[in-house]
Curated annotation (Swiss-Prot):
This protein binds specifically to 23S rRNA. The globular domain of the protein is located near the polypeptide exit tunnel on the outside of the subunit, while an extended beta-hairpin is found that lines the wall of the exit tunnel in the center of the 70S ribosome. It comes from the Eukaryota. InterPro entries: Ribosomal_uL22, Ribosomal_uL22_bac/chlpt-type, Ribosomal_uL22_bac/org-type, Ribosomal_uL22_CS, Ribosomal_uL22_sf. PANTHER family: CHLOROPLAST 50S RIBOSOMAL PROTEIN L22-RELATED, LARGE RIBOSOMAL SUBUNIT PROTEIN UL22M. GO terms for biological process: translation. Part of the 50S ribosomal subunit. This is Large ribosomal subunit protein uL22c. It holds the Pfam family Ribosomal_L22. GO terms for cellular component: large ribosomal subunit; plastid. It is found in: Plastid. Transmembrane segments: none annotated. Keywords: Plastid, Ribonucleoprotein, Ribosomal protein, RNA-binding, rRNA-binding. Belongs to the universal ribosomal protein uL22 family.
Amino acid sequence: MDNKKYKRACVMVRNIKISVVKVRRILDHVRKYSLRNALMLLEFLPYKGSLVIYKAIKSSYFNYKNFWDFNVTLDNLYITKAKADSGPMLKRSCPHSRGKAFPIRKRTCHITSMI
């Protein structure tokens, strides 16, 4: 088996104030597309997280361009890895009847994209 060194560029965006489930729903649409198609798709998706993912993928493209090959185009690159992991949770409480307090969990996530 070949032990080639593959050229990759990775970006991690941390502590985004969006739930992991909502981000994963968008990432499932985008995986395994060429960069041009993925960015075009993200531009027109009506979700809140699509703008953050758009910026992350575009940043990984510029990282690849600066580090490996300056003349590369969007059509030649593909998204090899795109994942969302849960981040720290902000815990708040909401007052309820009889002096009780119910917890509110404000979830955050980390996005990793690799081309």
